[in-house]
């Protein structure tokens, strides 16, 4: 059952639509390299499309009716958007759920130090990275510094063409004999992922100044951001690849960028959501944090945020609220866990079983199950739900494929799917196939981005 190449369906009009969507996506992924930046931009786009802040409706006691659009912001790191459907909430929602955190390197709480004539920031990597991929690259610093007076300072260094970039040094090949004898996982140690931020001492330093290079960095941070060294204690600073996403390939058919996992599915979910008006079932787009580290914490999918905000929505759309209505709503809901899958790579065919692999250019892909080895830890979607989705996609003319995450016993992975499925709703993973997954620069096919957005929209509009 080989799936067709979706590019072959393109005429000039469709090609223009593909390029228009992907141009917008390239801007999004270039500008939004942290979960906070993704939420901020999502709110901007939602409000431009007529969405209201749900908290304002709650405080005012404003009832909601079919067609109303609202969003809920959770701590600046998670966002849920809703379009109220014509069916009662009790009948369930159609949910798109993606994550907006990506593998990266975080700055520690007490990070700045001087070693010989270099100033460096100590770090702790976040998520599953191949550490050796992050050395000798131009890197940028994104994040916030929260000060004791309550102000929050936004920091972005390394993105503007006039900005300096930062980096983590690697060992020269001439002295790398011992390093190269190690396995890849051990060649670069986590404690050696130290970010170089300067090498010039402060001018006219006093004779007793022991760390003049560090002092210059602190004086620059004070001048530009009005922050002190102590403010690092309440900072969230993320180290990410510097520079924008770009067209990839001589034919410009692909996109190389940081954070396709999972911002390509986050953006296509958001873009599909913003197109939906007056659905039958209430539509929901849920963009969450912390998936790469287990979905824990107040902004991860394990948080009660989602259930709480659905309860608030029910209270504003129903004459009366009960916990039973909430439970029925969740049970009757359907969800697409909008997450990427591993694309077949002809350079590494040995890790895939071709018949059940996702291919770039053949549309978005459904993963009936993820997990590892014997499907450990997976959400295994029901056959009836897959049949329902096949019909939805075929009726809408969406190019899709099905896949597993590599050969049996080769490895595996997981998503937020099982967390929502634990609420007894129908859930399946589906999204864009990705090359170089979890590398600093990942690759996706433009036609897959387009078909994924179409598939998500078809699901939200489905009447059953």
Where are the regions a protein language model picked out?
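N-terminal hydrophobic/helix-forming segments and targeting peptides
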Residues: 1-464
